[in-house]
Curated annotation (Swiss-Prot):
Transcriptional repressor which binds neuron-restrictive silencer element (NRSE) and represses neuronal gene transcription in non-neuronal cells. Restricts the expression of neuronal genes by associating with two distinct corepressors, SIN3A and RCOR1, which in turn recruit histone deacetylase to the promoters of REST-regulated genes. Mediates repression by recruiting the BHC complex at RE1/NRSE sites which acts by deacetylating and demethylating specific sites on histones, thereby acting as a chromatin modifier. Residues 451-482, 498-511, 554-576, 851-860, 876-886, 930-943 have a biased composition (Basic and acidic residues). Residues 584-600 have a biased composition (Basic residues). This is RE1-silencing transcription factor. It comes from Rattus norvegicus. The gene is Rest. Residues 32-121 are annotated as: Interaction with SIN3A. One of its GO terms (cellular component) is nucleus. It comes from the Eukaryota. Residues 200-211 are annotated as: Required for binding to the neuron-restrictive silencer element. Residues 679-706, 713-734 have a biased composition (Pro residues). The keyword Metal-binding applies. Residues 484-493, 630-643 have a biased composition (Polar residues). Keywords: Cytoplasm, Metal-binding, Nucleus, Phosphoprotein, Repeat, Repressor, Transcription, Transcription regulation, Ubl conjugation, Zinc, Zinc-finger.
Amino acid sequence: MATQVMGQSSGGGSLFNNSGNMGMALPNDMYDLHDLSKAELAAPQLIMLANVALTGEVNGSCCDYLVGEERQMAELMPVGDNHFSDSEGEGLEESAELKGDPSGLDNMELRSLELSVVEPQPVFEASAAPEVYSSNKDPAPEAPVAEDKCKNLKAKPFRCKPCQYEAESEEQFVHHIRVHSAKKFFVEESAEKQAKARESGASPSEEGEFSKGPIRCDRCGYNTNRYDHYTAHLKHHLRAGDNERVYKCIICTYTTVSEYHWRKHLRNHFPRKVYTCSKCNYFSTEKNNYVQHVRTHTGERPYKCELCPYSSSQKTHLTRHMRTHSGEKPFKCDQCNYVASNQHEVTRHARQVHNGPKPLNCPHCDYKTADRSNFKKHVELHVNPRQFNCPVCDYAASKKCNLQYHFKSKHPTCPSKTMDVSKVKLKKTKRREADLHRDAAAAATEQTDTEQAKTKGVDASARRSERPVKGVGKDVPKEKKPCSNASVVQVTTRTRKSAVETKAAEGKHTDGQTGNNAEKSSKAKKSKRKMDAEAHPSVEPVTEGPVTKKKKTESKPKTSGEVPKGSRVEDRKADKQQSASIKKGGKKTALKTKTAKKGSKLAPKWVGHTEPSSEMAQGGESPVPALTQAVVTPSGSTQTELSSPMDIAQTEPAQMDVSQTGPPQVQRPLPVEPAQLEPSPPQEPPQVEPPACVEPPPPVEPPCPMEPAEMEPSPPMEPSQVEPPPHLEPPLPMELPQVELPPVEDCQKELPPVEHAQTKVAQTGPTQVGAVQEEPLFCLRATSSQANQKVISPKDRAKEKLSVLSEMARQEQVLIEVGLVPVRDSQLLKASKSAPDLPAPPSPLPKGHLRREETPKDQEMFSDGEGNKVSPLEKGGTEEAGESRAELAAPMESTSALSSEQSSNAPDGETLHSECQADSTAVCEMEVDTEQKTDRVPLKDSAVEPVSPLNPRVDPEAAAPAVVASPPITLAESQEIDEDEGIHSHDGSDLSDNMSEGSDDSGLHGARPAPQEATSKSGKEGLAVKVTEGEFVCIFCDRSFRKEKDYSKHLNRHLVNVYFLEEAAEEQE
């Protein structure tokens, strides 16, 4: 092609006017790029290769686009459709044909020599260029017009830019080129060989040699290492269409379909003038670029924005800036409607959104991106590896939530100390040290929390002061929510886990609804986070209901004793109907079966805990005294009169109320309120006792020892609402726990008289529990607030109880209709917290039955005692009542002691209130003792009664609370599950998702489809099992603890982690 162009030059036989010898350069002297090795080729940037003076104008007609172009243009043979081919063979053949023409051949040889000399100057440096051009600025202007060039060239000698050699004649210049090329370049002696080399694929091979990168255009051979440049290049092909012309530089691999860009490129190789910077090595053939560069040294910024202080050294920058004021966005993405004010923004958009080129490659891995900020963050992970490191393995996470998931999936059995994400600190460099510090801090915190909880509990019980209890609740919740919860609730000693879980859940709901945040700032934090997670599922129906229920529940405890049985019966009936509908749903049944199984397995452990921790559960009487003493210490009005099953049942309901109130108190840290509640409960228990006496207490106990707890919590709600129809209470199972306890409900039905009192008490407590379950955590706190209200005004309480009972029944019905579990469950959960005896009947009757079967008679007795308290409330089912009575026969023996304790606890409303206080004070002691006993008993419990994990304390008192407590545990579990779901379901934690879905109180039923109920059942069962496995079982990691202390600490960590995760999930949402 080049030969063709040169041969057709109209300037004469020779391109060099100064020399008439066209044949000086023999064919053997031809230089070509193809003959040069890759190392010998000059870099394209080294534009000053050789100002080869082409003396003739390029008027040739071989290429229309070359007409009128400078000689340099002729040298850089452009390739048109007619001339271009992938192999360049066509042009070479033409050049071979022209060999016969001496002028054409000589011209080509000369041009080739000049080009070859010019190209292969790897030695050439930018710094040299400035000197050459600065000294030779006059001869430089050879590019403008062919005619001008010819004139200039005629008057001036030939110059070799690389070495600054100047020749007066073409002959000298050619000779110099040969010498120069002999030193620097590989010289092809034969023009034929050179032509053959080109034809044989010199172009592909050389292009490969010259290629700047792995990206090559199949149509024109364009090479680049920039994908975006390649895509831009392809656009030229697309625009050119059939009339495409590819302009190719013969010196380098540059190709283009744009004549303008091709000409501009040629100036790099044959500049007519170079502007050099006197302060640096910068040089440019474009004056504008040179001027702009100089401004970088001078700091001149002549282009200023009229609308703002912005100024720029370049007009284009100012133009681009002005678009920020006008809002103009002329650049649009080719693949979508994205528009931007700058092209680079569109480019970045295409790379990120449309998987375009990602030039930013991580030097440490294969990560690629087009976003610089993301790139920096990614590289930071290599430089500063993940800050959150697993203390067990080498896993490191960049986020706490990821580390939390890692703990659950990879180290589910590891101790909570080690796995406490809340203790994880950012580690910039030393992972292990940070881990050690974190572990040590966690251990210290746990110890401190445990000691504080124990001390506070003891002080509270000794002082009977509500404030100390509150302090315990506050301090413990901060450090250990579980511990504080357990401390406040006497019966919850064994069920601390449940209490902790419930408190965590309650903290969430209660903090959101009751405004306990002020009382417990630490809990407020955690509970707020949990509430956010749980609030979505349960807040809609539960928020309103729980708040109202709180008030109602508060009024109930006050008036529960005063409330006529008829109203209670009506409430119970309503509750029973609701629970019946829920039971019909089948969700509760499944949960009951699963929970019953799990509860039966866990119940022995808890029973063991209950027996050793209280020893009174086994001793029967001794436990009662202990409970009674605990109650007396807080309220000072505790009565040990309740020795009969009825009394026990009543006492248990009172305890349930206390436990219910207690857990809320723990959450709310309202120790004083519990004390107040105690005085008012005394009124309630006495009033309730007559009805309780009317109903046979024994049947109450027989109902599922473990399940009764669950059943009872909901029945108490119903009884409080409708005491007369305790038999109607079977619907109460609407609460999942209640569903599990249908037999217990029957027993309760049979024991309506005894449990009417209990029902009243339970109504105060269990009813509240039901409300709490419906509105799990909110209701729990509501219960505590109710207890407070009871303490405040006993008379008002009686009045409020009536209204509250009816309202509670209505609310429960509404909640049930909405698909939420009645608050009773949550209250039961509270009760379970307060009554560790309660088997962990998270699941309904199934667990209760299993517990009964698996649970020894002693356990049954304990559970029966619990059943006595709750069963009447839970159900009026005659069958269950019969069973409970039958079971109560034996359990009543052990329950006799429980009843004595209960009698002491329940005889007076004060007993309940005192229990509340005891929950806050004595219960703290109880919890401490229970923790210690639990430490001993866990094994026994697991061996004795796997079914009733909540039975760690089988004390009569604990037994009754246990019945109520099991549902609370269910709530706690379900609530915590809900928390997990809020957090983990968001993150994809199967366990947490299932658990939370399975929890009726989770509030997820409204948010999620029915399958959740099944999951909630399984989740509750799993939680109950975990809680009841003869030890305190963590619902998060299935880890079991013999001591509530340890469990509370461990659970607190989970809860803290859950808060973090919930926050993250909320932020993402």
